[in-house]
Amino acid sequence: MARIAGIDLPKNKRIEIALTYIYGIGRPTAQKILEQANIDGNTKSDDLTENQINSIRHVIDSHYKVEGDLRTEVSMNIKRLMDLGCYRGLRHRRGLPVRGQRTHTNARTRKGPRRSVMGKRKKA
């Protein structure tokens, strides 16, 4: 089992798909990585040689920010917005949608489950 960027890649999948198990690598990025490493995307991940695995590791380490580094950068960006006190930062702080969606109705994913209010009942 190949281990790249601290993630065990699944054995039975094509390497193009297996690379997407790494946080920060999607299908297009996986294709670019394999192109730079001169590896066919249809190769199963357990059929890779040690040389090929090392070349993939080298490409990822030198060109891409993945896993812990990327998670840290994203959380630091959000923290920076919150510290600035800008509109987006306030929305993050309050747990509301950040990108202009309506909140009068909907936005339940971001706001969480409904809180019931006493006295708001249909009259019989």
UniProtKB/Swiss-Prot annotation:
GO terms for biological process: translation. One of its GO terms (molecular function) is rRNA binding. Residues 95-124 are annotated as: Disordered. The keyword Protein biosynthesis does not apply. Coiled coil: none annotated. GO terms for cellular component: cytosol; small ribosomal subunit. Signal peptide: none annotated. Keywords: Ribonucleoprotein, Ribosomal protein, RNA-binding, rRNA-binding, tRNA-binding. Located at the top of the head of the 30S subunit, it contacts several helices of the 16S rRNA. In the 70S ribosome it contacts the 23S rRNA (bridge B1a) and protein L5 of the 50S subunit (bridge B1b), connecting the 2 subunits; these bridges are implicated in subunit movement. Contacts the tRNAs in the A and P-sites. Part of the 30S ribosomal subunit. Forms a loose heterodimer with protein S19. Forms two bridges to the 50S subunit in the 70S ribosome. Belongs to the universal ribosomal protein uS13 family. This is Small ribosomal subunit protein uS13. The gene is rpsM.
